[in-house]
Regions:
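Conserved small/polar residues in nucleotide/adenosyl-binding loops
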Residues: 102-104
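N-terminal glycine-rich, Lys/His-bearing helix-loop that initiates the first secondary-structure elements
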Residues: 1-52
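Conserved N-terminal alpha-helix of the aminotransferase class I/II PLP-enzyme fold
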Residues: 46-95
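N-terminal active-site wall of soluble small-molecule enzyme domains
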Residues: 98
Length: 104
């Protein structure tokens, strides 16, 4: 494992850069970084809803990662001593189902 490389967090860093730009999205999610649902902000906190954003070029694409998600997956694989690592958003059941499809 390359410890110097492990000091970076490419996906988190990209999300933070996006958050600091204070962009108001016109796509999903509908709460518009908290502006459209103050109750959600009360429940989860401003920081949480402020980084709940849709897939876009600066944040890469989970289905076909080419930048920050790809780099983060490579760092994860390196940290666990694996050849590959893949991020999932559908929960454990979906991850296991996807894993089983790889071997078909």
């Amino acid at each position: 494992m390359d410890l110097k490389r492990q000091a970076s967090a490419p996906l988190y860093e990209a999300i933070e850069r996006f958050r600091k730009k204070r962009i108001v999205p016109f796509d999903v999610p509908g709460h518009k970084r908290g502006r459209g649902n103050p109750e959600l902000v009360d429940l989860l906190g401003e920081r949480c809803v402020g980084i709940d954003v849709n897939s876009m070029k600066p944040l890469d694409n989970l289905c076909h990662p080419v930048s920050v998600i790809k780099e983060a997956e490579e760092l994860t694989a390196d940290a666990f001593g694996a050849e590959h690592a893949f991020f999932m958003v559908g929960g454990t059941t979906q991850a296991v189902q996807n894993l089983s499809l790889i071997h078909i």
